[in-house]
Structure formats: structure tokens, C-alpha cells
Amino acid sequence: ALPILVRIGGSGLSLADHYRAGQLIARAAGRLGRRTVIVASGDLSHKLKEEGPYGFCAQGPEYDKRIMDVMGEARFGELLEFTEGFCEKAGECGHRSFTMMAGAMDGMAVKPRRLSYEGPFGVGYGICTFEVQGEDKSRFFLRAYQELEQEQCRKKQEKEDAYVSLARKSLEHYVHTRRMIPMQAVGGNLPDEMLRSRAGVFVSIHKNGALRGCIGTISPVCGNVAEEIIQNAVSAGIHDPRFPSVREDELQQLVYSVDVLGETSPIKGPEELDVKRYGVIVSKGRKRGLLLPNLDGVDTVEQQIGIARQKAGIGPDEKGVSLERFEVIRHGDKG
């Protein structure tokens, strides 16, 4: 019989989800009772050399060395530990394919062979093979990763202040009941500053180190900061158009941060910005875009303004744009 070729593409889902997809592939192959070969295709870093097509980034060679070490020794659990930010800076395009293949060999003893690595033109290429040798109960890597992740989330929850705790409780209550958490259920446990002051608030949600939702208000629209957090936590988890609504089975994996915005002030130009200290608001007519300060992957003022322009729908070369800056008090961390 002729071999059957099944092509499966990657996605923007998490590394854990791709590993899980690999497990499902293995389950399907097992039910068919056929010999199966899995090919995980994709380049390594595209940022190995200045003269290469995508330039140089320090994370490029670091990624290639790390991925070849991991794959060369079949340490598949470590594939799940690569952060989204690191992979993005490295400019790789194969990591999710590799992770899916690894998932298909979860719980299996594997004989790895590292055949080659090269990157002569600024893009990394590696070849490894893996031969399944039978079962190995010490190699259920996704289960171990999820247990570690849950423990880390639990420790973060223990350290949450009132702002972050309220954001978490607000979204969890909504996901469970489809109703907003009533103020009388939480107000007695909140510090006075959350009940007496008004400010714009952004709530950010991360999962596996990647953004899962972020919604906020530039100026206050609720009676106090606590109400602002409740509204924006639910909006970030349910109504951010970039992501599907948070599911109940995700709640224990989420990490929250709350940014309370200070007063905005107009500035003359980019020279008055600092990406670590100040957020920026870019405006033209009715178009307005905001970007918070001190975000992973935003390292220059030019990047910061460019992203804010994009969010506002203002072209990169459009004139007549006004800039404002603001500071925030950040509660929690960004994943």
C-alpha cells in the first residue's frame, strides 16, 4: 500500500497545546495500527548574522545552541520551557512543530541522533532523528510541566496584593456564574485607596508567559478603582477581540497584572519618552492609541510609538500626531 501523508500546521496556541496535539496524533496513529513516521519541519533562528536576510539578534545563536542540545538528547520536556518572548526575538519558525512531534512521543523511551547543524546564511538548519524504543514512565513531560506550572501559579497567587486578587476573583466569578461580582462581596476586604480614588486602569492576563487578554481605560469611567478593576478584568478575559473568551479550565493557569494610570501630560516629541518609565498615548482626531510602559519585547521609544500608532489606526508616516505620556503603578507582573 502507498504511504499516506497527512500535513498538520502549527498555530498561535501555546507550546503546551501543541504538545497535546502531538499526543492526539500518537493516539490516532495507535488506533490505526500502522507504522508511523513523524517529520517536524521548520527553520531554527533567522537572526544569526548581521549580513543575513533578517539581521542579527543575540537570542538567535542562543536559541540554536539550546534547541540543538535539547533535541540532540531528546530532552523534550525542555521544549515547553522556551518563553514566547525569547522565541520571538530569536526569529525561529519551527519550535511548535518540534514540540508537536515531541508530544507524539510522550511517555516513550527514545533513541536520539543529532545528524547536522549549520547556519551559513544567517538562518539555522538542524537535523535530528528519534527512534521509539518502548514505554518510559519517566518521560510524561506534559504532566510534569503542568504540575510545575500549577505550583508556580499557586505561589504567585499567594503573593497577590488586593488589586491583583480582585482582578482574579472578578474574572473567575464571571466565568463560573456569567455575572459580575457584586461590590458588597469584596468591598469589605479592600484598602480605602481602592474605594475612594478614581483612575484609569488596565488589566493584563497572561498564560504560559504569553498575553491572554488586556483591556483598560485611559480615564476613569467607574465610581472607584475597585469597580474599574472588576469591569476591566472581565473585559480582558471575555471581550478582548484578539483572543477567545477565557475558559473555566484555564483559570488556574492565568497570571494577572493591574496598571493604575497616573495623570497624562502632553509632550513635544519622542525624546521626552522612556519605554521603561512612561506609557504613551498617540492621537490624531478621534483616533487614539495607548501603550503601557515596561513591556517585554518593547525596547525602544520607536517601537512603543509604532505600536501605539497601529492600535490607533494611524499610519506610520501620518503627520499631525500628538503625543502624551503617563506613569503607572503596576501591581503583579506580566506573566
Functional labels for PLM-detected ranges:
Residues 8, 34-42:
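Beta-strand elements within well-structured catalytic alpha/beta cores of enzymes
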Residues 38-39, 90, 209-212:
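Short glycine- and Lys/Arg-enriched binding-loop motifs that mark or flank ligand-binding interfaces
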Residues 148-335:
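Basic nucleic-acid-binding interfaces
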Residues 41-52:
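A structural signal for small-residue-enriched, beta-sheet-centric alpha/beta enzyme cores
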Residues 12-13, 44, 262-264:
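Acidic, glycine-rich active-site loops and adjacent beta-strand->loop/helix elements
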Residues 1-24, 31, 50-165, 245-249, ...:
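Flexible, D/E/H-enriched segments
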